[in-house]
Amino acid sequence: MKLFISADIEGCAGTTLNYETHKEEPAYQKYAKQMTDEVVAVCDAALAAGVDEIVVKDGHGDATNIDVMAMPEHVTLIRGKSGHPINMMYGLDETFDAVFYIGYHAPAGDPGSPLSHTSTGASNFIELNGKRMSEFMLNTYTAAMYGVPVLFLSGDERICELSKELVPQITTVSSKKGVGGSAWNVSPKTVI
């Protein structure tokens, strides 16, 4: 089995405020480590369950947040920006059997996450056919374009709820509950 994982930082456990996601900030390192730890935990579990090959796409900012040195064997990490239009899903094609998302968050303009946005912080919100578009929705449609099912999502409680509207059978793990500019975070150890 071949698995594609797209990872972001805003939905990872503990991450609450925008500055925590920026490399130039002193607090950033611990949240990048949490992102790495969550990716490694999912990769380890998938490999133990019999997955043969995993490709992880670092999808946050400049896409160099995940520590490549921490990746298990049989995992390929795509770092950096390719300039490809499928962005957070770069590397996905029809040869994959499943897609997982790690660290995802509510869409732009949604009060369910203090870090809600869609692709960029520059928009109030993006709509598709009258529905607020999240990165989850955008990337799930990308996966569908290649015929690859989306099976797992971790992130804030709101994106976990919204994901079930599009993919009812998806398995989700909530890392936090956002309320306006705050988040009720579960222990990062619980998420891993």
Language-model features: locations:
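Extreme N-terminal starter segment of soluble prokaryotic enzymes
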Residues: M1-F4
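N-terminal glycine-rich phosphate/adenylate-binding segment common to multiple enzyme folds
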Residues: R79-A122
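Short glycine-enriched loops at secondary-structure junctions
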Residues: S6-C12, G59-H60, I102-A108, E157-I159
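Structured catalytic-domain cores with a bias toward divalent-metal coordination
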Residues: S6, V39, D44, A48, ...
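Active-site rim beta-loop-alpha module in soluble metabolic enzymes
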Residues: T142-I192
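Glycine-rich nucleotide/cofactor/substrate-binding loop typically near the N-terminus or early
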Residues: V39-E94
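Active-site glycine-rich loop that binds ribose-phosphate moieties when present
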Residues: H84, T120-Y146, G155
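Short catalytic helix/loop segments, enriched in acidic residues and glycine
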Residues: Y19-D44
